[in-house]
């Protein structure tokens, strides 16, 4: 068992502790902290279970399962907050997840990987495609906000209808991107394969790699059960976290904006963060970039649109009119990541630049007076 798995197993102790804190009245702040720590290992085991099931059901269905459950923790947490009417916190969590993935996680991955390897390489074409797709995500959340701030008397129903329409477009693009990455152009996303293959002509079949030696497959029913249990655990812990959010943030002296943009995304993405950094330190920067960019794209093209549609359906209308300050931070993150990843190489100094940018953004949100 790896050291990372042992750490996550130890962190499971916070699950019963969070229940005890809730039922025994240890205080909302204690419940908030313990529930947040409990979500971290549950999210990790959700990812492990998804990967094990994917091995059994095959690459296509497995890829779709991974794509669906890739940000399940954030989706569950955001849905519960949305159900409680904390719409601005949900929006802040979405933008914070994108910012955290692009700056904090990629920063640590590039920095720590760069300390072990002088220069690391990754597929520049896939990076450019991801960057272009991310640009569309920025446009999708920028335009509804621009409509609100450049027009007078825009009714809430107009913004809601626009947001639902944009959400449908984004989900359509997300589905097509899955077809692209797992079907027509899968070779671009196969780590260690793309750089050794020539670009096929249109209509030309891409030869399949030699099948790996047959190994004993994981127990499908066991890992399905694990996935169901940890998903339920994430839902319960998210209820505790959201229920104590407002009182806890006030007692800790944090604004809801800072909590949504910085604190909650770190909790929800911690397991994914560990994966991206670990593989980067093994000189698998292609895989690390895939984890980071894939997670960010899922937030922008799947989680956010689904929440818009679900909010509309359950009577908690959420539009894509974001806090302008959040949009500036997302735009900064996307621009600097696009600049750094465009050449297909990375070094530790670029990691420092990403981490420094995240630190500045986090400080700006900490001192931002807006209470959402």
From Swiss-Prot:
Membrane topology: Multi-pass membrane protein
Knocked-out gene: effects: Disruption causes the rapid degradation of pigments and salt-sensitive phenotype at alkaline pH.
Superkingdom assignment: Bacteria
A GO CC term assigned to this protein in UniProt: plasma membrane
Compartments (UniProt record): Cell inner membrane
Keywords annotated in UniProt: Antiport, Calcium, Calcium transport, Cell inner membrane, Cell membrane, Ion transport, Membrane, Transmembrane, Transmembrane helix, Transport
GO terms for biological process, alphabetical: calcium ion transmembrane transport; intracellular calcium ion homeostasis
InterPro entries: CaH_exchang, CAX-like, NaCa_Exmemb, NCX_ion-bd_dom_sf
Segments passing through the bilayer: 7-27, 29-49, 62-82, 94-114, 134-154, 162-182, 222-242, 251-271, 294-314, 320-340, 352-372
UniProt pH dependence: Optimum pH is 8.0.
UniProt keyword Transmembrane helix present: yes
Family: Belongs to the Ca(2+):cation antiporter (CaCA) (TC 2.A.19) family. Cation/proton exchanger (CAX) subfamily.
Alphabetical list of PANTHER family matching this protein: VACUOLAR CALCIUM ION TRANSPORTER
Name of this protein: Ca(2+)/H(+) antiporter
Organism: Synechocystis sp. (strain ATCC 27184 / PCC 6803 / Kazusa)
